[in-house]
UniProtKB/Swiss-Prot annotation:
Pfam families: DHQ_synthase, DHQS_C. Keywords: Antibiotic biosynthesis, Cobalt, Lyase, Metal-binding, NAD. It comes from Streptomyces paromomycinus. Transmembrane segments: none annotated. The active site is at K142, E244. Binds 1 Co(2+) ion per subunit. SUPFAM superfamilies: Dehydroquinate synthase-like. This is 2-deoxy-scyllo-inosose synthase. The lineage of its organism: Bacteria, Bacillati, Actinomycetota, Actinomycetes, Kitasatosporales. Its cofactor is NAD(+); Co(2+). The gene is parC. GO terms for biological process: antibiotic biosynthetic process; aromatic amino acid family biosynthetic process. NAD(+) binds at residues 42, 73-76, 105-109, 129-130, 140-142, 151-152. PANTHER family: 3-DEHYDROQUINATE SYNTHASE (PTHR43622:SF1).
Length: 386
């Protein structure tokens, strides 16, 4: 497995990436000599990889137990963490146990929060099985779950000891999840690493059929992009906030859809909304909006708010965005990450955030929720009166 040292200010952990490397993953976990391996995954991943990993660990590493939770965003709740904690303790977990987060971003957050809470903190190792997890969520110290008021509102910061990623696990992903992952890849290219845009445009596949070599490049570039902004901001409260590009509206869409819209799909729409808002405010050109639409389409993602989502619900959840409080912002506005060009982030002082009137943001959301056959283009939007 190829290893990259992920350095965040005063802390560091190894990110190991390979293909067809299940045996090495078990060997690496075995080196930790855990009293018990607590393999956390959802019920879908349990059938695909969880039971096999537990059996391999039992054979070659030490005692292991499978802790499962129901699949889906609606189960990313503090109650799920509590249930898993009870399962772990009943199975004999102690301070020398290791939590193995086997799954996507939802499981990674649930397991990460679990590891931070058991005995006030035990070892956490990520074994990501989705694109979003491999190139985004496992590279963050943020461990959070949802509340009734919005996404990722309850959580903490906790460092994994290691990440062990096998791209072969992506072969069992449905196309929906692969496309979702590409939403985060497009974000990295547009907001952080514009040097990857040209090749990314050539590598993206609307049918979500990716060769191993292309996927390895996509993951490696995205890991480098994220490390570029978290190296000096491990808590993602300064420059690291750029990783929230597209997430203001994206999270609101996800929450309004009650788990029916994948994370990366929501982010893709959120980025187009953000580009439209930047254009309306006079910071960006229509070309930037067009580039967003082009890359989102090449990834096989929708460029408009899904019909199953009520735009009024989206606008409601925008008022609970988790970036509120980072900067002074009137009640009728919300802080957003906006671009003036690829890789060029607008700032208010030292932060990559600008206040956006909720009325203007709401009009951009409405424009992307146009009925089929009706344009949601720039002609339907005009700047708010001065």
């Amino acid at each position: 497995m190829h290893v990259t040292a992920i350095t965040m200010e005063d802390t560091s952990f190894p990110y190991r990436l390979g293909t067809e490397c299940a045996e090495e993953i078990v060997a690496r976990l075995g080196e930790r000599a855990a009293s018990r391996y607590l393999v956390v995954c959802d019920t879908t991943v349990a059938a695909l990889y969880g039971r096999d990993l537990v059996a391999r660990l039992e054979k070659d590493a030490g005692p292991a137990v499978l802790l499962t939770h129901p699949a889906g965003e609606v189960h990313k709740r503090i109650g799920t963490v509590g249930d898993l904690a009870e399962q772990a303790l009943a199975a004999g977990a102690d301070r020398r146990s290791v939590v193995v987060a086997l799954g996507g971003g939802i499981t990674g957050n649930i397991a990460g929060l679990l590891a931070s809470l058991l005995f006030r903190g035990i070892t956490l190792v990520h074994v990501p099985t989705t694109v979003v997890a491999m190139l985004d969520s496992v590279l963050s110290l943020k461990q959070a779950v949802n509340a009734s008021f919005g996404k990722n509102l309850v959580g903490t910061f906790y460092q994994p000891a290691e990440v062990l990623a096998d791209t072969a696990m992506l072969r069992t992903l449905p196309a929906r999840e692969l496309r979702s992952g590409m939403g985060e890849v497009v974000k990295n290219a547009l907001a952080i690493r514009p040097s990857m845009i040209e090749r990314l445009a050539a590598e993206l596949r609307p049918d979500a059929r990716y060769e191993d070599a292309a996927m390895r490049w996509i993951i490696e570039e995205s890991v480098a992009a994220k490390a570029q902004v978290t190296g000096a901001d491990k808590h993602e409260r300064r420059d690291g906030l750029v990783l929230e590009y597209g997430h203001t509206t994206g999270h609101a869409i996800e929450h309004a859809a009650r788990g029916e819209v994948a994370h990366g799909a929501g982010v893709a729409i959120g980025m187009i909304v953000a580009a439209e808002v930047s254009r309306l405010l006079g910071h960006a050109s229509g070309d930037l909006v067009g580039l967003h639409r082009e890359l989102v389409a090449k990834a096989g993602l929708e460029g408009s708010v899904p019909a199953l989502v009520d735009p009024a619900d989206v606008k409601h959840w925008l008022t609970y965005d988790n970036k509120r409080g980072y900067m002074p912002c009137p009640p009728a506005a919300t802080p957003m990450v906006l671009l003036s060009a690829p890789g060029e982030v607008l700032r208010s002082g030292p932060l990559p955030l600008v206040p956006v009137p909720l009325e203007l943001l709401g009009r951009a959301v409405d424009a992307l929720a146009a009925p089929a056959g009706q344009s949601a283009g720039a002609e339907r939007l005009s700047p708010a009166p001065a």
